[in-house]
Design a protein with these regions (language model features):
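Active-site acidic-Proline motif in GNAT/NAT acetyltransferases
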Residues: 93-95, 99, 127-128
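Acetyl-CoA-dependent GNAT
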Residues: 3-18, 22-95, 106-108, 112, ...
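Acyl-donor (CoA/ACP) binding surface of acyl/acetyltransferases
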Residues: 99, 103, 118, 147-148, ...
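Helix-turn-helix
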Residues: 132
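Conserved catalytic-core motifs of GNAT/GCN5-like acyltransferases
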Residues: 122-125, 137, 142-158
Length: 165
């Protein structure tokens, strides 16, 4: 895990600072807006984000820009076998992409998972999303040899990537 950035999660922005923190119930409406912006072709509906919040509140982090709202989030699914988990979603608003916020969200949640004694972290990514694949590789994730065809249904192939903590 030596590739993780420093432990300071505060990141300068044009209007002050953003803070990575645990999601709160009052964040859910704003989280829906953020998810719709980050994933316009397939955002989570409110009820799904609500259920994921109810199931995994300790492993759902947001990038809070204060009065400017939420700019990113990462969501981890923790099954009963807490030694293995899945990154279910990582999203950053368009105006904040390319600034390292996705990396910081991932680093924060990976530190949290390491502290929770998780040994294996998996995620899926669209095979054409080279930017995300490179981010995950830079954090130590390794890709399976080939994308899984129709992983999320017809024409929704995904590359499965794994990190051993």
């Amino acid at each position: 895990m030596s590739t993780l950035p420093a432990d300071d999660f505060r990141t300068p922005t044009a209007n002050g600072s953003s803070l990575i923190r645990q999601v709160e119930e009052t964040d859910l409406p704003e989280l829906v807006r953020l998810d719709e912006e980050a994933f316009p072709e397939g955002p989570y509906p409110f009820f799904t984000l609500r259920q994921l919040f109810d199931l995994y509140p300790d492993h759902m982090l947001v990038l809070d820009g204060g009065e400017n709202g939420l700019h990113g989030y990462v969501l981890v699914g923790m099954p009963r076998d807490a030694h293995r988990c899945w990154i279910l979603s990582l999203g950053v608003t368009r105006d904040r992409r390319g600034r390292g916020y996705g990396r910081q969200l991932m680093a924060a949640v990976l530190r949290q998972l390491r502290d929770d004694a998780v040994r294996e972290v998996l995620l899926t990514v669209e095979p054409s999303n080279i930017t995300a694949i490179e981010l995950y590789k830079s954090l130590g994730f390794a890709a399976e040899s080939a994308p899984r065809k129709d992983y999320f249904g017809p024409n929704a192939d995904r590359l499965v990537m794994t990190l051993h903590l």
